[in-house]
Amino acid sequence: MAATILRLSLLTAFFLPTLNMANDRPLTVDDLLALESVGNPQVSPDGQWVAYTISSRDTEEDKRTTQIWMVSSDGGTPIPMTSAGYSASNPRWSPDNKYLSFSASKDEDAKSQVWSLNRLGGEAIQVTNVKQGISGFEWSPDGSRLLLIIQDPKASDLTEDKDDDKKPLPHVIDRMQFKRDYVGYLDRRRRHLYVYTPGSENPTQLTSGDYDDSDPVWSPDGKSIAFVSDRSEDPDLHWGTDVWIVEVDDPDSEIIQVTTNEGRDDSPTWSPDGRSIAYRTATGYDVGGSALTPTRYLASTVIGRDERKILTPELDRNVADPMYSADGKTIYFKLEDSGQVHFASVDKDGRRLIRNLEQQVNVRDFSMAGSKTVLLLGRPDQPAEIYQFNDGTLDQLTNVSNKVLDGVSRASVEKLEFERADGTLVEAFYYRPIDFDSSKRYPTILWLHGGPASQFTYDFSTTGQLYAANGYVVIMPNPRGSVGYGEEFAKGTVAKWGERDFEDVMAAVDYGIELGLVDANRLGVGGWSYGGILTNFVITQTDRFKAAMSGASLGLTTANYGHDHYQLMYELEFGLPWEFPERWVKLSPFSKVQNITTPTLWMGGALDWNVPIINSEQMYIGMKRLGRDTQLVVYPGEHHGIRRPSFEKDRLERWLAWFDERLK
């Protein structure tokens, strides 16, 4: 069905005439591997410095490493704070501004501990020595104590024999939720909160029980800690969380439940006077990342009242990471909206919602302290960097990507909106190839995002830029099921995978043909995770595509029940497989594998328990048995994401080779 345009985005964005000079060269796979990622900005309490992480790929050791850097909040030369010999993460400033603390495991077999480094230099000092390691930490407001997140110990953690860690033991399982990708089989060990005074022998445990505790934040007076936990009768059968408070100096006191809502309450932040807590709330079950994702609102409550006040009731968009201003009058947060993440704010009473940065950028993170605010944001032509934000203006503090991208052409990107036959408005990002000629039509790759509850944004897409650098038009749509367009839109694929979203992505292709960009006879399609799943639904319903790449995707849906880690999601969205067998068959691309004529490359990690490799194996063997053009690539030791640099390179090169051979 042909798509009809209603209107364009604010402008046809980022044609980058100043970046694509005549002697610039195209982006390569090696360029992408050389790119470093900036993350986790933390402004010092006095506002003078910004600590952050830089993650890079060590191609010789074939692994990723992360170091901590800092830069003046007013600009200047960045300073490395940790060495390249080990990975360090989670930077946190001591309240007196003197020390920069972080998490690291310096030895090969060591567990993650808290380390501290004098801001002026010197060697880092190990602060904690927890046998099983720590999962997170935060300094108390007066700097005298540390809040730690520690998982319950296993038997080998309680012995001095290091070989005990290497002795395999049987997995004894009695939980409903018994698997997790990157973790493995789950036992009854949970993550709890502890408080630790540096120099003392052992931390003091604050929370316990058959529950996981997360998102802890100190109260301004340092006497209490707010945290998030699902303390229902069986958390494995319940997809909701509440905000709780525990008293630090009286661990035997009763834990106080702050919120009692049915859905997921998380991301608490204290008001400066300690009387209120703002947090993120959902009005229904929130199965993160799935089609069952309700709108996540900003809310607040006065301690002791159990009265939820939704501060963004008319804003049918997701919020994240709320933070009070120093005077307590304003709450800042990230706001997902129409292919973008804004830096937004609202008065503490829910009045005067403001999008503080009206630019075509994607805000990944922010930090505020003293009088300074910094944003970590990406642009279509530049990976995420750190900027100081002041009254609507941005001053760039880091330029990590420039050493790779200087002299490299980048594709122009525009976001277009078109109307479906039922009146639904759908958006897609269109990447034009380098040296684009408007008189020509180009081979085109339809690239689909994961989730489905996610969205393509005004951010630097390595995939989109790489394909465009190799002569492709790239279409990256936000079909129904995507976030950023309201709850009804996000729930448009509940138990209907491959229906409306299939129609929407095909309409994005048809609109590209109407624009004169797309060669209808040279179409490719691909994606990873739900992007791979939707790819499967595309190629089982149409033969318009000449090549496909399906990564970490779904085959026979019933085979995943109890095999991946989405058991509760399946039950809530699809119903039990023995009660609704027809629905489970309909939602299985494998049941239509005989319809696939598109040459398809199947990929996945051998250890993926998110969307297990059995799915790609099923789809591959079905096509192979039918005599179709297909190939399966399995990456040993990898989970849902491919992290080993040599495998990352292999995957990108295989993508290009597969599409080039069939579309050019």
Regions found by a protein language model. Name each.
Residues Y285, V400-N521, W528, N560-H563, ...:
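Cap/lid segment of the alpha/beta-hydrolase catalytic domain
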Residues I54-Q67, T82-A88, S103-W115, E123, ...:
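A flexible loop/linker signature enriched in serine peptidases of the S9 family
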